Amino acid sequence: MRIAGVNLPLNKHAVIALTHVYGIGKTSAKSILQRAGIAPERKISELNDEEAHAIREIIAEDYKVEGQARGEQQLAVKRLMDIGCYRGLRHRRSLPVRGQRTQTNARTRKGKRKTVAGKKKATKK
């Protein structure tokens, strides 16, 4: 079954399967299923066309998903960088934005280590 351009895994519960769509987490998935009148434990393969259509309609009218959500996220980060605020500068320099330490750790954000040659020790005469 496809929702918002994403193939949902048929063997998973509806709540978990909906989280495969970018922009829908567990809480959103539960509220979508509740509004559609579908039990969260039902598997995607058990849903009929009418129920799938109800889910698609709810998502289309109330949620920003996939490309729209990603684009909005990128625009928000770009805005921070353009106005030159502290968070924008951290994004621009590829450093952690939320106050984490960087002397050690932060490898995920900073990337692989760039080795800098150390000073050579003077030899004794």
Curated annotation (Swiss-Prot):
Keywords in alphabetical order: Ribonucleoprotein, Ribosomal protein, RNA-binding, rRNA-binding, tRNA-binding
Amino acid composition bias (Basic residues), ranges on this chain: 107-125
Alphabetical list of Pfam families matching this protein: Ribosomal_S13
GO MF: rRNA binding; structural constituent of ribosome; tRNA binding
GO biological process: translation
Coiled-coil residue windows: none
Name of the protein described by the UniProt record: Small ribosomal subunit protein uS13
Chain segments carrying region Disordered: 92-125
Record-linked InterPro entries: Rbsml_uS13_C, Ribosomal_uS13, Ribosomal_uS13-like_H2TH, Ribosomal_uS13_bac-type, Ribosomal_uS13_CS
An example Gene Ontology CC term for this record: cytosol
Quaternary structure annotation from Swiss-Prot or TrEMBL: Part of the 30S ribosomal subunit. Forms a loose heterodimer with protein S19. Forms two bridges to the 50S subunit in the 70S ribosome.
General function of this protein: Located at the top of the head of the 30S subunit, it contacts several helices of the 16S rRNA. In the 70S ribosome it contacts the 23S rRNA (bridge B1a) and protein L5 of the 50S subunit (bridge B1b), connecting the 2 subunits; these bridges are implicated in subunit movement. Contacts the tRNAs in the A and P-sites.
Organism expressing this protein natively: Chlorobium phaeobacteroides (strain DSM 266 / SMG 266 / 2430)
Family: Belongs to the universal ribosomal protein uS13 family.
